[in-house]
Amino acid sequence: MNGLALAYLGDAYYELEIRKYLITQGIRNVGKLHTEKVRLASNEAQASIMNYFLSLEILSEEEIDAYKKGRNKSHNSRKQMDMVTYQQATGFESLIGYLSIIDEQRAKDLINLGITFIKQGGYNG
């Protein structure tokens, strides 16, 4: 599977899961929903989550391969972020896209672990 195509899917899947999480937390103000969604789904947050997963050594070889497929693809980063952060975030999205196809529960479990990491101060955005 193409890494950038997986990242495309993973980006949408991750954002949907973040939005569902925020709604279930009782946030009703649209401005607050948007602010929290941006904080949890930013490239910087995704890169932090990915680094956290790697530090825990909880990913299988197949999952690491899916991450690398997205991370190693040639693409242009946005001006306001560095290339390493962009590559890590794209790799994270590729991993989530891959898992959303082959093991949706694992994708959700990792997303929930990432949310917990961010909420406990792993990334303050």
UniProtKB/Swiss-Prot annotation:
The active site is at residue 11. GO terms for cellular component: cytoplasm. It comes from the Bacteria. Its cofactor is Mg(2+). Its main location: cytoplasm. GO terms for molecular function: ribonuclease III activity; rRNA binding. One of its GO terms (biological process) is rRNA processing. Coiled coil: none annotated. It is found in: Cytoplasm. Its EC number is 3.1.26.-. Keywords: Cytoplasm, Endonuclease, Hydrolase, Magnesium, Nuclease, Ribosome biogenesis, RNA-binding, rRNA processing, rRNA-binding. Involved in correct processing of both the 5' and 3' ends of 23S rRNA precursor. Processes 30S rRNA precursor transcript even in absence of ribonuclease 3 (Rnc); Rnc processes 30S rRNA into smaller rRNA precursors. Belongs to the MrnC RNase family. Homodimer. This is Mini-ribonuclease 3. It comes from Acholeplasma laidlawii (strain PG-8A). The gene is mrnC.
